[in-house]
Amino acid sequence: MSETLVVKIGTSSLTNPHHPGLALSTIAGLVEVICQLRRQGYNVVLVSSGAVGVGCTRLGLRDRPSRIAQRQAIAAVGQGRLMRTYDDLFTTLGQPIAQVLLTRGDLAQRQRYINAYQTFQELFELGVVPIVNENDTVAVEELKFGDNDTLSALVASLVEAQWLFLLTDVDRLYTADPRQDPNAKPITIVHDLSELESIQAGGQGSRWGTGGMATKLTAAKIATQASVRTVITQGRSPENLLKILAGEAIGTWFEPQPETVNARKRWIAHGLVPTGKLLLDAGAVQAIQAGGKSLLAAGIQAIEGDFEAQDAVQLCDLNGTEIARGLVNYDSHELQQIRGCQSDQIVQILGYEGAETIVHRDNLVLS
C-alpha cells in the first residue's frame, strides 16, 4: 500500500520577501519534488497557504487586512490565481491536481468527515494531487482552523498519512527564535512534545501569514497523536523532502506516538470544536485517566458553556487543565441540575430516564 504524505507550505515560503508576488522558483521547485514523489509511488496532499497574500498583491494592498469580511473577500480573489499558478506548473509535468477547500464544519460533522476521507481516497486512486486550503470565503470565525498548520495536521489524521511536512521560513525548530537570539540552539528530534514545554516558540506568523512556530507545535501534537511522523524544515529548499525520505537528518523530526485510539476517537479529539467544559473532582479524573472509565454525574463539580446533547466538551480537573474530550449525553441546562448526583437520581430530577453516563468511555478520548 502506498504511503501518504501531507506537505504544508506557508505564505512566507510562497511569497517574495522583498517585492510583491509569488516566489515562483520556490513553487516550481516544490511542484517538481511532488511530481518526483508521485513517480516514486507516494500519495501526496499539498496544503497551501497564500490566497490572502496573492489577493492583496492583485489588489495592490500593502498590508494584510484586519477585518474578517475583507480578508475573506481578498482570499476569494487570491485563491483562483494561486490555483492557476499551481495548475500551470503541474500540467507542464503531466500531473493532474484537484482543489479541495475545507472548513472546520466539514470535519466537525461525522458524515461530512467520512465523505471527505472517501473523496481523498478516490483522488489518490485517480493519481491526483489534492491541493487543500481553508475555505476562507465562507468560514465562520468560531469554526475556523485558524491557520493552515492546524489544517494540515487534521488532514494528515483524516487521510491516515505516514508523514506531515511543515515547510516554513526557518530550517528547523530552535530553543528560541534564531533571528532574535544568537544563543538559540537547533532541535533535531523530539520524542515527546512535553520536552518542549520550556521552549519559547513565539506566537506570531509572518507579515502575510497566520502561523508562527507555536501553531506548528500544535500541529505536531495533533499529527503525532495520530501516528504521523512530522518534520519542520525550510520551505525554500523543497528538495529536502526527498533527502528526508531517504533518511537524511534534516529539520526537526517529531516522532509519532503509538496509535492508541481508532479513527472515530481521533475525530472526537481533533475534528470537533468543544462547546463547553466540565470540571471534575479528583476521583473522576483518576477514574478516567487511569481506569478508562466513563464520566458519571457524581464526578462533575462545575459546568462552563452552553451546549446541546452530543456536542463535544472538554473534561478538566479543578485547575482547568484538560484531561480528555468527549461527546456529552445531556445538554448544559440538564447537567446543571444533575451534576454531583448519583446516576439513579437522574430520573427523579429530570423526570425521564436518560443515559446513566454523562460521557461514555466509547465517546471519550484522553488529551
Curated annotation (Swiss-Prot):
Purpose: Catalyzes the transfer of a phosphate group to glutamate to form L-glutamate 5-phosphate.
Annotated protein name in UniProt: Glutamate 5-kinase
The reaction(s) this protein catalyses: L-glutamate + ATP = L-glutamyl 5-phosphate + ADP
GO molecular function: ATP binding; glutamate 5-kinase activity; RNA binding
Domain PUA: 275-353
GO biological process, one term: L-proline biosynthetic process
Gene3D superfamilies according to UniProt: Acetylglutamate kinase-like, PUA domain
Residue sites binding substrate per the record: S49, D136, N148
Pfam family, one: AA_kinase
Keyword annotations: Amino-acid biosynthesis, ATP-binding, Cytoplasm, Kinase, Nucleotide-binding, Proline biosynthesis, Transferase
EC assignment: 2.7.2.11
Subcellular location: Cytoplasm
UniProt xrefs under SUPFAM superfamilies: Carbamate kinase-like (SSF53633), PUA domain-like (SSF88697)
Keyword Amino-acid biosynthesis attached: yes
Species for this entry: Synechococcus elongatus (strain ATCC 33912 / PCC 7942 / FACHB-805) (Anacystis nidulans R2)
Listed GO CC annotations: cytosol
Functional pathway: Amino-acid biosynthesis; L-proline biosynthesis; L-glutamate 5-semialdehyde from L-glutamate: step 1/2
Binding site for ATP: K8, T168, D169, T210, G211, G212, M213, A214, T215, K216
Highest rank taxon of the organism: Bacteria
Family: Belongs to the glutamate 5-kinase family.
